[in-house]
A protein has these predicted regions:
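Histidine-acidic metal/acid-base catalytic patches
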Residues: 2-61, 65-67, 129-131, 186-208, ...
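Active-site acidic/histidine proton-transfer and metal-coordination neighborhood
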Residues: 18-26, 104-205, 215
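Active-site-proximal loop/turn and secondary-structure-junction residues that shape catalytic pockets
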Residues: 51-53, 78-80, 98-100, 139-141, ...
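Catalytic domains of carbohydrate-active enzymes, especially glycoside hydrolases
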Residues: 62-81
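Anion (oxyanion) recognition and catalysis
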Residues: 67, 86, 126, 164, ...
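Short acidic, glycine/proline-enriched helix-loop-strand junctions
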Residues: 83-95, 168
Length: 294
């Protein structure tokens, strides 16, 4: 497949950003391979490395399979992995930002250290043509939701200018506090949306994790349509179990993806499930991506 107009802009942009390194890459054996066709449908589909659980693939093997299956990119990879993603025409769709699930940006004492890490992550993402950096609120640990909201807004207000200047979106992740992450503060869409409203920047949005918000709220499609302007990225997994979203779980992902696509959403939907041990990981990934071709 030739690198032409049929290759989506972000994928072409990622390769163009690193184009000055082409000669060096060829010499060192990391030049881009021929790009596989992306998945059909209106949504760009990405992956988290958890989908390869149960395989013995190294990073290059994972990138090779991701490209073969028509993925747009891979989430939560840092600069050391950018060259191998580039080799297979994959975008680093979400870059780690330096905050943590338990210790995050809702606590002022973390702001100096995490702010420096976040600024570096934004620079790394911009240099690679990566669209997003992840942020995590952190656990409550005695902090009220209102104080935590104020602290989170303060942090993101301090980071929004470098994000805006470098065209990178900082995505605050919504997680469930009921099953997987007891105490996590950013556990409801309304709280996350309020953060985004107060910061008021096109480069501060939410990472809407469908699995987590199904546990906390349900009503996924209506919630997404109401708040799509504040959503910069999606994660998928089946519930219960956080495995593949087949007929062993409760959500209709074809319907959910259609609802997302109907909003005109232009970002990425990345699969973050872990395949059941009785399933072939690569066959499962192919099947899950087919479900989301809407």
């Amino acid at each position: 497949m030739k690198l032409g107009s049929s290759v989506p802009l972000r994928r072409r942009g990622f390769l163009a950003t690193l184009g000055s390194l082409t000669a060096f890459s060829i010499i060192n054996g990391t030049a881009p391979t021929a790009l596989a066709e992306l998945r059909k449908g209106r949504l760009k589909q990405g992956l988290c490395l958890s989908v390869f659980s149960g395989t013995k693939l190294d990073m290059e093997g994972k990138c090779r399979e991701a490209a073969r299956l028509g993925a747009y990119g891979i989430d939560l990879v840092g600069p050391k992995d950018f060259p191998v993603l580039k080799k297979y025409g994959l975008v680093p769709t979400m870059v780690p930002g330096g905050s943590g699930i338990q210790s995050g940006i809702n606590d002022k004492k973390n702001h100096a250290e995490m702010g420096a890490k976040m600024e570096q992550s934004i620079k790394d993402a911009a240099a690679a043509g990566a669209p997003n950096v992840i942020a995590l609120a952190g656990d409550r640990k005695g902090i009220s939701d209102e104080e935590g909201l104020d602290n989170t807004v303060l942090f993101l207000n301090n980071i929004k200018k470098p994000a805006e200047d470098q065209n990178v979106t900082v995505c605050l992740e919504l997680l469930n506090s009921k099953v997987d992450h007891p105490g996590y503060m950013c556990d409801h869409t309304t709280w996350g949306v309020e953060v985004c409203k107060r910061v008021n920047s096109p480069r501060i949005k939410l990472l809407y994790d469908i699995y987590h918000m199904q546990i906390m709220e349900g009503d996924i499609v209506r919630t997404v349509k109401k708040n799509i302007q504040y959503i910069g990225h999606f994660h998928t997994a089946g519930n219960p179990g956080r495995h593949q979203f087949d007929d062993t779980q409760e959500m209709n992902y074809a319907g959910i993806c259609k609802g997302i696509a109907d909003t005109g959403y232009q970002g990425c939907l990345s699969h973050e499930y872990s395949p059941s041990k009785d399933k072939d990981p690569l066959e499962t990934l192919d099947a899950m991506m087919r479900i989301c071709e809407v």
